[in-house]
Amino acid sequence: MDAAEVEFLAEKELVTIIPNFSLDKIYLIGGDLGPFNPGLPVDVPLWLAINLKQRQKCRLLPPEWMDVEKLEQMRDEERKEETFTPVPSPHYMEITKLLLNHASDNIPKADTIRTLIKDLWDTRMAKLRVSADSFVRQQEAHAKLDNLTLMEISSSGAFLTQALNHMYKLRTNLQPSESTQSQDF
């Protein structure tokens, strides 16, 4: 799965908007949305929120976790722990990217949030590289991927898969085949 597919999945996450228009419910295959009343918050999928924002039909409210203090705490905790810590959303990176690209005017301290999310991402990717290196060096057959997001797995998955395939080939070439006869008499 590539980054575009992961981002597509993230667009289904619900975010809160404050519409500036009136509309009864919208009936979609995935469920009903609305009603939309000016000034009253409503939860909608991210894809719809971005579409409405681009048409200047709403104001987006950032998710609860998209707060400078909370993100600083998460970043610091991630740096302290050896293992991956839980993240506030399984699509935190994609949601942040989309909201900051399309609605940064609705997000207080957007530049600081962008930096904190990037720091969190970099810390987690460094941990992932170290874990992958250790995994390959110890010739493990299984890995535990607790608290990793789909985007993090996707971004390192191709490399890790290739590395494991190469290790498998090396291991099978080094082992004596079953058809080889023993020299013992």
Curated annotation (Swiss-Prot):
The modification Phosphoserine is found at S182. The keyword Ubl conjugation applies. The modification N-acetylmethionine is found at M1. The modification Phosphothreonine is found at T180. It comes from the Eukaryota. There is a cross-link at K109 (Glycyl lysine isopeptide (Lys-Gly) (interchain with G-Cter in SUMO2)). One of its GO terms (biological process) is DNA replication. Keywords: Acetylation, Chromosome, DNA replication, Isopeptide bond, Nucleus, Phosphoprotein, Ubl conjugation. Pfam families: PSF2_N, Sld5. It is found in: Nucleus; Chromosome. InterPro entries: GINS_A, GINS_bundle-like_dom_sf, GINS_Psf2, PSF2_N. The keyword Acetylation applies. GO terms for cellular component: CMG complex; GINS complex; nucleus. Required for correct functioning of the GINS complex, a complex that plays an essential role in the initiation of DNA replication, and progression of DNA replication forks. GINS complex is a core component of CDC45-MCM-GINS (CMG) helicase, the molecular machine that unwinds template DNA during replication, and around which the replisome is built. Belongs to the GINS2/PSF2 family. Component of the GINS complex which is a heterotetramer of GINS1, GINS2, GINS3 and GINS4. Forms a stable subcomplex with GINS3. GINS complex interacts with DNA primase in vitro. Component of the CMG helicase complex, a hexameric ring of related MCM2-7 subunits stabilized by CDC45 and the tetrameric GINS complex. PANTHER family: DNA REPLICATION COMPLEX GINS PROTEIN PSF2. This is DNA replication complex GINS protein PSF2. It comes from Mus musculus (Mouse).
